[in-house]
UniProtKB/Swiss-Prot annotation:
Gene behind the chain: xseB
Originating organism: Caldanaerobacter subterraneus subsp. tengcongensis (strain DSM 15242 / JCM 11007 / NBRC 100824 / MB4)
Record family assignment: Belongs to the XseB family.
Catalysis: reaction(s): Exonucleolytic cleavage in either 5'- to 3'- or 3'- to 5'-direction to yield nucleoside 5'-phosphates
Protein's name in the database: Exodeoxyribonuclease 7 small subunit
Keywords from the UniProt entry: Cytoplasm, Exonuclease, Hydrolase, Nuclease
KW Hydrolase (keyword) present: yes
Job description of the protein: Bidirectionally degrades single-stranded DNA into large acid-insoluble oligonucleotides, which are then degraded further into small acid-soluble oligonucleotides.
InterPro entries found in the cross-reference section: Exonuc_VII_S, Exonuc_VII_ssu_sf
Primary site of residence: cytoplasm
Amino acid sequence: MEKEFNFEEDLKRLEEIVDTLEKGNLMLEESFNLFKEGVEISKRLEKMLKEVEGKITMLISEDEEIEFKEEENNV
């Protein structure tokens, strides 16, 4: 079963990873593994944002079409 991802949880985890890496107290392999996890999370977050952006764009364009049709009827 695939894990369901949550934007806020992923963002919080990414912030934790960045904080840990910035401290610089890890061995190379640990740093690499955290960096890799951070990149994977970052890609997921970007994908989620693009999906939401697309949905918002669709909603806005649908709303504009409705408003335009209403204005046509009032003419």
